[in-house]
Structures are given as structure tokens and as C-alpha cells.
Regions:
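Cytochrome P450 core scaffold surrounding the K-helix E-X-X-R motif
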Residues: 37, 192-200
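Hydrophobic helical h-region of N-terminal Sec-dependent signal peptides
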Residues: 9-13
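Bacterial N-terminal signal peptides that target proteins for export
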Residues: 1-8
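Disulfide-stabilized, aromatic/cysteine-rich ligand-recognition loop
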Residues: 21-24, 103-104, 108-111, 122, ...
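N-terminal signal peptide c-region/cleavage motif recognized by signal peptidases
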Residues: 16-17
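Active-site microenvironments of metalloenzymes and redox enzymes
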Residues: 48-145, 254-258
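Mature N-terminal segment immediately following signal peptide/propeptide cleavage
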Residues: 25-32
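Short, well-ordered junction/capping motifs at the entry into regular secondary structure
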Residues: 99, 154-182
């Protein structure tokens, strides 16, 4: 009888955990967005997908490294992260004052972020998925005042990163119900280096880099006024998979229904 009760309790807890996980994601409907750069002009179609409501927090990442010792600060292989990996944590299993439990985890490499998402049966969002979600306004699929919306984002990009970071849910939720896509941390995407791949395939291998950093003067830009997008592309193009950056976090995604 006790064994049956224990099994039932375990099943109930597992179901509750699954419900919490489900509530932690929102469905982004299929749609399109206009990328700042690409070989083909116009909008890019993005299939429906699910995205975490918030960036992954220090508390969530602590649970991950407790369960997966090889991803702890003192044990991670140099191949998968540089020396900045979780450098602001007090100890391997003690985030400390600079990394509050509800603040977004940062100083994690792309390898670590990808592995964390896989451990949750999720994945990192693609760049197109992230940009599709991030293009939404607060009350509508597109901002009511695009210029003011872009200015607000750019103002955040201009602010220096100070630790400890605020808790997730600090900035604003967009039309899809996703928080903190702007205003808290930069975020890893699965194909973060796609801009570099595109640039390398051109006759002028340095052309893309110059476009990314020349902002409104860039040739081939979909929107010369969207400086914030230029900064995101430049950040992605200058980052390597093992880099751990103080203001770079991540959130997870998974395939959705059409």
C-alpha cells in the first residue's frame, strides 16, 4: 500500500512539474519578420514554435550544474567555455550575492546553454525565431510606434551592465507574453554565427562586418534606422561558442504546431 502511495505521489509530482514547465513557455504563431541582412530581400517565414517566457535564471542553472557536474565552473572542459564561465558566482555551487537566484544566468557559453536546453527536452531558439518574437510590440504583433519602440531598446543597449542583475520579468512582456527579450540581457541563439558564415561566403569576406558596425550607413539594410538590430548582429558576429559574456544569457525553445 505504501509503495502504491509513493508511486502515485511521484506521478502527481511529475505531472505538476510538467504543468509548471508548460506554463513557462508560450506559443509563438507562425509568421514572418524582416531580417536586417540576408541574401534574399523581404520577409522570412518562421514556423510556429514555443519559447520560454523568461530567460533562464541563476537558480535554474544551479539545479542544472548540480545534476550535471561536468558543467560546473571548476570542472568544465576549456573546449566548451573560456575562463569567464560563471566567473561572477561565488563558488561552483554557490551563486552568491552577484548572482541572485531569480536573476538571469550570464557568463555561460553557447555550448553550456545548448546543453542546458537539451536537458529540459528543449533547444536554443534560432536567430529567426528569436528575432520574430522580439519584433512584437507590447500590445500588438507589431509596435504601434516603431520609432519609439526602437529608441527604447537602443537606450537599454547604451546602459552599462551592472551586477547583480535585476530579476527576470524586469523589463516588459510583449504581445506574445514573452518577457525580457529587450532590456535585461543579450541572449544566445542556436545559429548565432550565421552572420559570420554568410559573410565568409561573400567575395568580400569583410563586407558583412563593416555593414554590421556602420549602422545606418550600411548597404543592404532592411531598416537603416534600427540601430539596435545592427548591434545584435554585430554582437553575434563577434562571439565564439566558448565565450562567456557578463551580459549574455539565454532562454530555451522547442518546436510548436503550425
Amino acid at each position: 500500500m505504501r509503495r502504491l502511495a509513493a508511486i502515485a505521489l511521484g506521478a502527481a509530482l511529475q505531472a505538476a512539474a510538467s504543468a509548471v514547465a508548460a506554463e513557462g513557455m508560450v506559443q509563438i504563431p507562425a509568421g514572418d519578420y524582416r531580417p536586417q541582412y540576408g541574401s534574399e530581400p523581404g520577409a522570412v517565414a518562421v514556423d510556429a514554435f514555443e519559447l520560454d517566457v523568461h530567460p533562464v535564471s541563476n537558480g535554474e542553472y544551479l539545479a542544472f550544474v548540480m545534476a550535471h557536474p561536468k558543467w560546473r565552473r571548476g570542472q568544465i572542459a576549456p573546449l566548451f567555455a573560456d575562463e569567464a564561465y560563471l566567473s561572477h558566482w561565488q563558488e561552483d555551487l554557490v551563486p552568491g550575492a552577484l548572482a541572485p537566484a531569480h536573476a538571469p544566468v550570464t557568463n555561460v557559453s553557447w555550448f553550456a546553454a545548448r546543453t542546458y536546453c537539451a536537458s529540459q527536452d528543449k533547444r536554443l531558439p534560432t536567430m529567426d525565431e528569436w528575432e520574430r518574437a522580439a519584433a512584437a510590440g507590447i500590445d500588438a504583433p507589431e509596435p504601434a510606434n516603431p520609432a519609439a519602440f526602437k529608441r527604447r531598446i537602443l537606450d537599454w543597449y547604451a546602459e552599462p551592465t551592472r551586477l547583480p542583475l535585476p530579476a527576470v520579468g524586469h523589463s516588459f512582456a510583449n504581445h506574445f507574453g514573452v518577457w525580457d527579450l529587450h532590456g535585461l540581457v543579450w541572449e544566445w541563439v542556436s545559429d548565432f554565427n550565421a552572420t559570420m558564415t554568410t559573410g565568409a561566403s561573400r567575395k568580400d569576406a569583410g563586407g558583412l562586418d563593416r555593414q554590421l558596425f556602420c549602422a545606418a550607413g550600411a548597404v543592404g539594410s532592411a531598416d537603416p534606422g534600427d540601430y539596435a538590430a545592427f548591434m545584435r548582429y554585430a554582437m553575434r558576429g563577434s562571439t565564439k561558442a566558448r565565450h562567456a559574456v557578463q551580459n549574455m544569457g539565454f532562454r530555451c525553445a522547442r518546436d510548436g504546431t503550425r
